[in-house]
Curated annotation (Swiss-Prot):
Belongs to the universal ribosomal protein uS11 family. Coiled coil: none annotated. NCBIfam families: PRK05309.1 (NF003698), uS11_bact (TIGR03632). It comes from Cucumis sativus. Signal peptide: none annotated. One of its GO terms (molecular function) is rRNA binding. GO terms for cellular component: chloroplast; ribonucleoprotein complex; ribosome. Part of the 30S ribosomal subunit. Residues 9-23 have a biased composition (Basic residues). The gene is rps11. This is Small ribosomal subunit protein uS11c. One of its GO terms (biological process) is translation. The lineage of its organism: Eukaryota, Viridiplantae, Streptophyta, Embryophyta, Tracheophyta. Keywords: Chloroplast, Plastid, Ribonucleoprotein, Ribosomal protein, RNA-binding, rRNA-binding. It is found in: Plastid, Chloroplast.
């Protein structure tokens, strides 16, 4: 019986380094999406292709702890650690959402050593669009 041809790039043949880490990205965009329940940090190149991402949930926080500022700080540090190794020096920051993690994530991004060209708040604001949900009665 003939031997099966080993598949290139599969986990079974022991290739450890990923193909994405070979790209050098000098400039990128950091998207922070801070809701009341979670904070998601996505790092893309200038064309919008995702390089790295992290969230408070993937960092090990569960339940209501995902919405805390410390969880957002951890998620931002986790997402940026990989792209600094790939050579990112400059970045634009887009912050979306009303959550507690906005400022903490921005503080973690500033501390990472990446030069920020600008910080923009891209939270969607309705011009009196849909009717909001009724008030909670607890």
């Amino acid at each position: 019986m003939a031997k099966p041809i080993p598949r290139i790039g599969s986990r079974r043949n022991g290739r450890i380094s990923s193909r994405k880490s070979t790209r050098r990205i000098p400039k990128g965009v950091i998207h922070v999406q801070a809701s009341f329940n979670n904070t998601i940090v996505t790092v893309t190149d200038v064309r919008g292709r995702v390089i790295s991402w992290s969230s408070a949930g993937t960092c090990g926080f569960k339940g209501t702890r995902r919405g805390t500022p410390f969880a957002a700080q951890t998620a931002a540090g986790n997402a940026i650690r990989g792209v600094v190794d790939q050579g990112m020096q400059r970045a634009e920051v887009m912050i979306k959402g009303p959550g507690l993690g906005r400022d903490a994530a921005l503080r973690a991004i500033r501390r990472s050593g990446i030069l920020l060209s600008f910080i923009r708040d891209v939270t969607p604001m309705p011009h009196n669009g849909c009717r909001p949900p009724k008030k909670r009665r607890v």
